[in-house]
Amino acid sequence: MDITNSPGSPKRLNVAIIGSGISGLSAAWLLSQSHDVTLFEASDRIGGHSNTVEFESGHGPVAVDTGFIVYNEVTYPNLTALFRALDVPTAASNMSFAVSVGNGAYEYSGGTGLGLFAQRSNLVSPRFWSMIRELLRFYRNAPKDLSIMGGISLDDYLARNGYGRAFREDHLYPMAAAIWSTPAMEVGRYPAASFVRFCCNHGLLALRDRPIWRTVTGG
């Protein structure tokens, strides 16, 4: 759609934008500089996935992001530019990951050996070591298989390649559920190629040299 009469003579338009997530708000902010914008939102608040709530703790008020709100400057160049244009303060984010199953019966955290084996029983757990082996195999092979995945689901890809329940239920599905705020039981229905491509683009399948993640200061 051409929104100008000519390069030197813009026509002021009435623009409707549906949805007040990051895409809608960014478009509204940019277009409002030259046009009349009306924003439509079905919810009773704006912000979409971004939603910070505050609660009182024993140490004072704490701001909590109910969504998984982080970005990195490599994968999100336009968002980075928007934050800089608006002077939005950001800070480095701790991107740690931990899993707890069965009310603490089985737990581990990523990042270091201390976290992986914080629960000493993991040292002699066949299920845990199976997860580690298949994690390394998936991280190594899944990107290479992108061209042959076609339209199959993540569940189908994992089944065809012999990945077991430990890897699915104790690592891959909880990680995806945390990132996308979706039930872990639904992750397997995602298209395998889209899932793996997202993970590759965001450095999630790299064991080292991962991107530096940031978040908005104060939520």
Regions found by a protein language model. Give the residues of each.
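Mobile amphipathic helical/loop "lid" adjacent to a hydrophobic cofactor/ligand pocket
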Residues: 72-207
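Extreme N-terminal leader/targeting segments of oxidoreductases
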Residues: 1-15, 34, 55
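Conserved beta-strand segments of alpha/beta enzyme cores
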Residues: 36-38, 63, 89
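N-terminal Rossmann-like FAD-binding beta1-loop-alpha1 element of flavoenzymes
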Residues: 12-39
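Short, intrinsically disordered, charge-balanced linker/junction segments flanking boundaries
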Residues: 209-219
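Glycine-rich FAD pyrophosphate-binding loop
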Residues: 32-56
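N-terminal glycine-rich dinucleotide-binding loop that anchors FAD/FMN and/or NAD(P) in oxidoreductases
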Residues: 53-79
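Short, solvent-exposed loop/turn segments at secondary-structure junctions
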Residues: 22-23, 44-46, 177-178
